[in-house]
A protein has these predicted regions:
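Hydrophobic anchor at the beta1->P-loop junction of P-loop NTPases
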Residues: 30-32
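Conserved lysine of the Walker
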Residues: 38-39
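Post-Walker A helix-loop "phosphate-sensing" segment adjacent to the P-loop in P-loop NTPases
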Residues: 48-57
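Conserved nucleotide-sensing/catalytic segment adjacent to the nucleotide-binding pocket
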Residues: 65-122
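Pre-Walker A adenine-sensing motif
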Residues: 3-23
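Conserved P-loop NTPase motor module
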Residues: 146, 160, 166-231
Length: 231
C-alpha cells in the first residue's frame, strides 16, 4: 500500500505569482545544416528581444548592425557574458556555431555549466546555433529548454520549436525526436540580411581550449572577396 505524506501547513502559506512580462530565461538551440536559416532565425529573435526588452544587455559572437551589444571575441568575453548581471532587465548571450566551442570531444568546464544551469536566477537567456544536435556536449544538451529545428523553403523560413526536455533518440526512426511546442514562420528579407555580417565565418577552432584565452579566429570579406581578420 502506498502512503501519502501531505504538508497541510504549506496550504496556508502565501504564494506570489511570477510577474508577467519578465525577461525570459533558458537555453534555446537553433539546429540545421548550412543554408537551413538557423543563424538568420537566431538574428531575427535577437532583434525581437531587443524590441520587447530594450534594457537587456546583449552579447554575441556574430557581428550585429544597428543595435547596442557586446561582441564576444575571446573566452574572456564569453566568461563575462555568462557572469554579467542585469537584474530583471535580463542578459541575452548568443553563440553561433556553438558545436565548435562546446563539443562532446572537449567537454565543458564546470564553471560554464554552472552559469548555464542558473540562468533563471540570473534572468539570462542563451541562444546557440549548431549543425548537428549530437555534436554538442551531452552536459549542455541536458540544459537546453528549447530546440529549434530550422527549415528554409525558398525565402520562407519554417521553424519547429521542440521542448528540450522531451528530446530523445528514436532508434526506429534513427533520429532525434521531441514534443513540438509551436511553429514559427517568417519570410527572409533585406532588413534581416543587413542586420548582421553575413560574410563572417569561423574557420579555425584548433587553438580553443576551455582554460585558455583563445577562441576561433573570425574572418570577414570585403566586396572583392579579400579576407579580413575581425579583431
Amino acid at each position: 500500500m502506498i502512503k501519502y505524506q501531505i504538508d497541510w501547513q504549506s496550504f496556508k502559506e502565501k504564494y506570489i505569482k511570477p510577474k508577467k512580462g519578465e525577461f525570459p530565461t533558458g537555453t534555446r538551440v537553433y539546429k540545421g545544416f548550412q543554408g537551413s536559416g538557423k543563424t538568420l532565425s537566431m538574428i531575427s529573435d535577437i532583434y525581437q528581444c531587443r524590441t520587447i526588452f530594450p534594457k537587456a544587455i546583449i552579447f554575441s559572437n556574430v557581428k550585429l548592425k544597428n543595435i547596442d551589444y557586446h561582441f564576444i571575441k575571446d573566452s574572456g568575453d564569453l566568461k563575462k557574458a555568462l557572469e554579467t548581471q542585469n537584474g530583471k532587465d535580463g542578459v541575452l548571450v548568443c553563440i553561433d556555431e556553438a558545436h565548435l566551442f562546446f563539443n562532446k570531444k572537449d567537454g565543458i568546464s564546470l564553471d560554464v555549466i554552472t552559469c548555464i544551469s542558473q540562468q533563471r536566477k540570473d534572468r539570462r537567456k542563451i541562444f546557440f546555433t549548431c549543425q548537428i544536435w549530437e555534436d554538442l556536449d551531452v552536459s549542455l544538451r541536458k540544459q537546453v529548454k528549447e530546440v529549434v529545428t530550422c527549415h528554409r523553403v525558398g525565402r520562407l523560413q519554417i521553424n519547429k520549436i521542440i521542448d528540450g526536455e522531451s528530446v530523445r533518440f528514436d532508434k526506429q526512426l534513427g533520429t532525434w525526436t521531441g514534443q513540438t511546442i509551436q511553429y514559427n514562420i517568417f519570410k527572409h528579407n533585406e532588413r534581416l540580411y543587413n542586420s548582421y555580417d553575413t560574410f563572417q565565418k569561423i574557420i579555425n577552432n584548433r587553438d580553443y581550449e576551455r582554460n585558455t584565452n583563445t577562441l576561433p579566429i573570425y574572418y570577414s570579406q570585403d566586396r572583392a572577396g579579400k579576407k579580413i581578420v575581425v579583431k
